[in-house]
UniProtKB/Swiss-Prot annotation:
Catalytic activity: orotidine 5'-phosphate + H(+) = UMP + CO2
GO molecular function list: orotidine-5'-phosphate decarboxylase activity
Active-site residues, Swiss-Prot/TrEMBL: 61
Protein name, entry field: Orotidine 5'-phosphate decarboxylase
Organism of origin: Saccharolobus solfataricus (strain ATCC 35092 / DSM 1617 / JCM 11322 / P2)
Gene from which this protein is expressed: pyrF
Similarity annotation: Belongs to the OMP decarboxylase family. Type 1 subfamily.
Function per UniProt: Catalyzes the decarboxylation of orotidine 5'-monophosphate (OMP) to uridine 5'-monophosphate (UMP).
Length: 222
């Protein structure tokens, strides 16, 4: 049984000891570019290797031609999955990245809707067409956009939906899951806390209680 609905967004370092204490309370870890710029690739790898989490996701929001994106991900082999933007299109870009990841048993998430206020939905149909053509493992839909989560869950019933923007960006814990997301991505509310483990446990309890009320179960059947 999966342990949690929470993916820890790591944009700044936490000690290995703290991460080991939290591993049983997490689904996964999302590695942000600021963390890798601070530590470097080798130290980031050393920090994460040995952690018992379901998924390590590198979130550089890749947005380039296929050759460049492949050159980036091949240097980050410690990760299970990678996040890329959808708007860059398929041919010569996401198609090449997806083939490379498939060949190396890695997963792809595509950004569908970002969590910030300025994100435009004018190109939503185009984004959805790209997602359908690429068929990634999952999609990223901002946790502050609950109506969009519900819409994307309806349109992409079997895909994993991960939702950032919970806590510090204004999303309420548990709301994204109730709207249709599988996991909520939470960073600053945990890693900036005086006791990250206590903060994580508190958040997990809030999510569990809310999801039990809205869905009657902690995890959905796929």
């Amino acid at each position: 049984m999966l342990k949690s609905r929470v993916i820890l967004a790591m944009d700044k370092p936490l000690s290995y000891q703290v991460l080991k204490e939290m591993e049983n309370e997490l689904y996964g870890i999302k590695v942000g570019l600021p963390l890798v710029l601070d530590l470097g690739v080798d130290k980031t790898r050393e920090l994460l290797i040995g952690l018992d989490v379901e998924e390590i996701i590198v979130d550089f929001k890749l947005a380039d031609i296929g050759y460049i994106m492949k050159s980036i991900v091949e240097r980050l082999s410690f990760a299970n999955s990678f996040i890329a933007h959808s708007f860059i299109g398929v041919k010569g870009s996401l198609d090449e990245l997806k083939r490379y990841l498939d060949a190396n048993s890695k997963n792809l998430y595509l950004v569908a809707v970002m969590s910030h206020e300025g994100w435009s939905t004018l190109f939503a149909d185009y984004i959805k067409n790209v997602i359908r053509e690429i068929s990634p493992k999952g999609i990223v839909v901002g946790g502050t956009k609950l109506d969009h989560i519900t819409q994307y869950r309806r349109d992409f019933e079997k895909m994993t939906i991960v939702s950032p923007g919970m806590g510090s960006q204004g999303g309420s814990y548990g709301d994204a899951v109730c709207a249709g997301a599988d996991y909520e991505i939470i960073g600053r509310s945990i890693y900036n806390a005086g006791n990250p483990l206590t903060a994580l446990r508190t958040i997990n309890k809030i999510i569990e209680d809310k999801v039990m009320k809205c869905k009657g179960a902690i995890f959905r059947k796929k």
